[in-house]
A protein has these predicted regions:
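Glycine-rich hexapeptide-repeat left-handed beta-helix
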Residues: 1-11, 45-48, 53, 59-61, ...
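Generic amphipathic, hydrophobic interface segment in small proteins and small subunits
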Residues: 30-54
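N-terminal segments that cap or nucleate solenoid repeat domains
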Residues: 1-36
Length: 176
C-alpha cells in the first residue's frame, strides 16, 4: 500500500513495482525499475528514504530513518529478504544478505557484501568491494571478484525483469 503521511507523499519512479502487501509511506522517493517485494516496509514517517534505480527490496525488508535524517539506498542494490536498513547508506551495486541489520549512520560501500544475518553496527563502514559477515560484522580479508560481479549483475537484472512482469502476471487463481 502506498500512502501519504502528513505532508509527504511517496514518489515512485517509472517501471517500479510495489507489491500490494508492501507498505510505502511518507517522505519516500523510489527510482525507476525497482522491485519492492511482498511485506516490505519503507517508512518515511520520521525521516526521508531515498532509493535509487533498479534496486531490489526483497520480501519483508524494513527501511526506516531517524527523525529529520535520511536513509539512502543506491542504484542496483539488492536488499535480501527480511533485512533491516535503519538510518544508513547503502551504495550502488551493494548486496545486503537475508536477515542482516544495517544500523544507524553505517555505510555500505559500492559492490560491498553484507552476509546473511550479519549486524553492521552504528557508524560502521564497510569498504567498497569488501565482504562483511558475523555479529557484529567483521570485514573479511577478501574482495569481491569480477566473476561475482558478473553473476550478481545477472541476478539484479532478474529483479528488474520481475518489476516489469508482475503488474500483468500477478493475479488471483482462476483469473486469466
Amino acid at each position: 500500500m502506498i500512502n501519504a503521511f502528513e505532508d509527504h507523499t511517496p514518489v515512485i519512479g517509472p517501471g517500479t513495482y510495489v507489491h500490494p502487501s508492501a507498505d510505502v509511506f511518507g517522505n519516500v522517493q523510489i527510482g525507476a525499475g525497482c522491485w519492492i517485494g511482498p511485506g516490505a516496509r519503507i517508512r518515511g514517517d520520521y525521516g526521508r528514504i531515498v532509493i535509487g534505480d533498479h534496486t531490489a527490496v526483497e520480501d519483508n525488508v524494513v527501511i526506516h530513518a531517524r527523525p529529520d535524517e535520511q536513509t539512502t539506498i543506491g542504484d542496483w542494490v539488492t536488499l535480501g529478504h527480511a533485512c533491516i536498513i535503519h538510518n544508513a547508506t547503502v551504495r550502488d551495486w551493494a548486496v545486503v544478505g537475508m536477515g542482516a541489520i544495517v544500523s544507524d549512520w553505517a555505510e555500505i560501500g559500492p559492490w560491498a557484501v553484507v552476509g546473511e544475518g550479519a549486524v553492521v553496527r552504528q557508524n560502521q563502514q564497510i569498504p567498497p568491494e569488501r565482504i562483511a559477515v558475523g555479529v557484529p560484522a567483521k570485514v573479511l580479508d577478501k574482495t569481491v571478484t569480477d566473476a561475482y560481479k558478473s553473476e550478481w549483475k545477472h541476478w539484479k537484472e532478474v529483479y528488474v525483469d520481475l518489476a516489469r512482469r508482475y503488474p500483468a502476471g500477478l493475479r488471483a487463481p482462476g483469473n486469466r
